[in-house]
């Protein structure tokens, strides 16, 4: 039966730049591995689950009226262990190794006519073949993250224009050996040479590098990595870095090569690097006999996308909070079926993640593992969900979270909460369950006068006592501490350098931190990091947690202010005028107030600049108005990065120091460190946030915050970190779950979900702690 909808408008032949979501539904985690597979739209290449899922394919059709889809399903192949390996006759890197693991099934159909289409139809055949050969959306997502880190260089910008001559690529081989694969062409002289050996073997004999050593020609392009849209591997041997050539089309035309006629047939350097990361062992070693692999609701693992364990451990911890999980599930049930742009909508991807992690539908042993080990008494681990769409959306435009590098889980958690708050579509802002108000007291050591300031927060840094008890192989050994001891240390006064506004003493001051309100969920970050010079070193201090996980936080409650306290005066602002410029301007006949106003407007710079400003503003109606104190106050800068604040706190600075340093250094971390260290006499009080006055705060306090005592919390989750830096190493999450009617600790290590007998491993690795308030 013919279909009138089988047209070039409805059936598109995708090019290399097209993102193809052929692995899973864009609105939920139903995938090609589930019964019934998924429907891939052949017009825009977004996918939706069919009748056996949540019918998101029908949702997509109703929104777009794209009629032609192909149902994609796959079944794992059984591994034949005694099959001899295929003889290697040439260097070959296959684009999609999944073909070795799965049998794929494709059924094209028209949703309007409700018929199955002939897969041999020429238009369908071309579209399906191009779709199969294209890079999958999940891989393209990760490759983009790696490629975003590449830049150009002076050697590319200043590449000399050579006379055009033709380089023959037919049956091309290395000029110094017979290799025809992994060929690199010199962008100076056009010489063809093989590349260096690659991770895992193969690659070449390094003759491209030898060519650079012999000639000094710095740039080469990998021929079979070039695609018609200008994507190509460029390597600068002089910089010893992979680069981007924005003028690759012009540079290739110098050698008579039109890139529009080329096709990418080999893996790029980014793909090879990604492959190495994905094959790296991110998992823990074999667990002890007391451990048990778990499956079911709330016990779904997340596949490591390559340095994404910080994201996985954070999301597992967040979705272990009942209020957060219920909120996101409700939005999933109401919003995901009406969202117009699911692949770029944060709320849609959060809802998708909620259904994936909480429902238990996808928490089951790996099909391939079961097929290849049918007689094993030990169930294989889960395959794990791959949250690449969520990672793409949440990291969009961010210089760190938009890459495939390891990141700080605490920074990511605070960043994510801010992102959710800004993009919330619900009447209830679920991130308010983490909100609380902190009070800081500054006390002059000389005159004893005090100042109180308040600010809002969603996380508190825990001071970890550091008592050295020995050394093993150059590594310091520290005494065990409890969370209660950390709480006691956190509320102790910190002494700081300070010049008092009241008594003018430079004796210093103390600051103490307390909490004016307590959130439903309290996030604590253990400050295990020490600033040694400009190097941040992680300290392996064991932190013991209570077996029952119950803690009383009354000691953190801010006390009533004593009636007999004397207060420091409100800070006033003055400016040291450029007296020389003022005298010269007055000598020209300008009144003092005009001289000052000109210098204020021009940064208190010099006579000539101020004079030019005066001539341009002689008619300003307020030019003779006396200067108000408010005009001398520094302008508030709301762009201070919370991630940068947390990074500076890891160096051992206070939040107030971090904010002040970043304000003074245009949000640059290195300059902020220099500024703080070079201003020992600066008063680093935390300025009250707008609207944070206690009277205003109490009137508008969210229903989740509490000022009631006793303040009791239950430890719900621990994000643990192995490694020397929060931006490297490996993250896992320990979460308290109900297993067989009892509260047990469960380890979430990427896709591995196991019951653990103890928290011994979390002692020296605990980094972020999530507590639930017991009301």
Swiss-Prot record:
Zn(2+) 3 binds at residues 153, 155, 236, 239. SUPFAM superfamilies: Cysteine proteinases, RING/U-box, UBA-like. Zn(2+) 4 binds at residues 174, 177, 194, 207. It is an enzyme of class 3 (hydrolase). Its EC number is 3.4.19.12. Zn(2+) 1 binds at residues 25, 28, 49, 56. A zinc finger (UBP-type) spans 1-108, 151-259. It holds the Pfam family UBA_7. Zn(2+) 2 binds at residues 41, 44, 60, 66. Zn(2+) 5 binds at residues 186, 189, 211, 217. Disulfide bonds: none annotated. Residues 576-617, 639-679 form the UBA domain. GO terms for molecular function: cysteine-type deubiquitinase activity; K48-linked deubiquitinase activity; zinc ion binding. Residues 300-774 form the USP domain. It comes from the Eukaryota. Keywords: Hydrolase, Metal-binding, Phosphoprotein, Protease, Repeat, Thiol protease, Ubl conjugation pathway, Zinc, Zinc-finger. The active site is at residues 309, 730. This is Ubiquitin carboxyl-terminal hydrolase 14.
